[in-house]
Structures are given as C-alpha cells and as structure tokens.
Swiss-Prot record:
Component of the GINS complex which is a heterotetramer of sld5, psf1, psf2 and psf3. Interacts with sld5. The GINS complex plays an essential role in the initiation of DNA replication. Has a role in chromosome segregation and is required for bir1 localization. Belongs to the GINS2/PSF2 family. This is DNA replication complex GINS protein psf2. It comes from Schizosaccharomyces pombe (strain 972 / ATCC 24843). InterPro entries: GINS_A, GINS_bundle-like_dom_sf, GINS_Psf2, PSF2_N. It is found in: Nucleus.
Amino acid sequence: MALPRELEISFSPEEMEFLAGNEYINIVPSETMDQLPLVSATIPIMKPPKKCRVPLWLALELKKQNLARIVPPEWMEIGKLENIRDDELENETFSELPFRWLETAHLLLNFCADDIEDVEDIRRILLDIREARQSKARTGLEAINEVQLTLDNLGAMEINEIRPIFREVMDRMRKIVQVSQEE
C-alpha cells in the first residue's frame, strides 16, 4: 500500500510510542515474579518491595494487571521539571532531556497517572516545556542555512515532527543556492 509522502519520511505518534516502549523504567512489583527471559534481556526475579528495571512496555502491562506500581523517572519529578521549564524559557538552547522524553511522559501520564504525585502540575509543566521547545524549533528552522541545522538535545518525537518540514526547507535551500551559483 502506498503511503502519503509525509508519512513516508516520519513516524506516527503511535509508532514513536511503540519505540519508546523499549526504554527501561523502574517498577515495584506487588508480588514475587519469576525470572523473565526476553529477546533483548532477561528480567531478574522480582520481589516486592524491591525496585526492578524493566522495559516500559512490560511495566505498563504489569501495571494494567495490578502486578506492579510504576516509579516515574527522576526527570519527571516536579522540582526538576520546573527547573527545566525555567531553563527552556530563559535560554536559547534546548535543555537536556531523555531522547524519548515526550513519548515516555505521554505513556506514563495516560496509563499510570495514579502512580505519579502532583500529576496535574506535571502535565501543565510538561506542556509548558513542550511549547517552549516547539517555539525554539520553529525559530531554528527560520534561521536555517543550506549547510546545516543545529538543534542539540531535541527528543525523538520533536525530530520526527520537524523532519518533513526540515526536508522540504533543505531541498528548497539547495535549489536556491544551486541556481545562484549557476548565475
């Protein structure tokens, strides 16, 4: 089946979340579970109340079955997010966040909000961070040249969102430069 051109060069948000499912996160199991051999790794025996690192997809599945509580990553603590938001608003550069921060936050907020303290404040702060970063990305695209675009510390979803625009802009810039060099 042929896909529209814009879908050929980027992933859907659902595909990005699927990829984020391979990121590791801490859980606290609610009961003892045997060692679990996976394709990519083996999850050791899980015993409550000891934390265990598992892929996000497994954490969400265990949460759904009430077999574990998800421990939000440190970067999702309200104080750290407030610092990141302030940094995003005060500086022209992007703050350092995990590569799949947006997808991970979306999955955690949608499927285990009851495991997150101050969840509504965290949602609001994450939205502020997202809007500040989108504004910076747009500004970066406006300042583009035909050779490169430097947007360090962008996350996977952010890169995926600007990829179609970036590709089109770069193609047009190359054509303009090529025409001006021919003249």
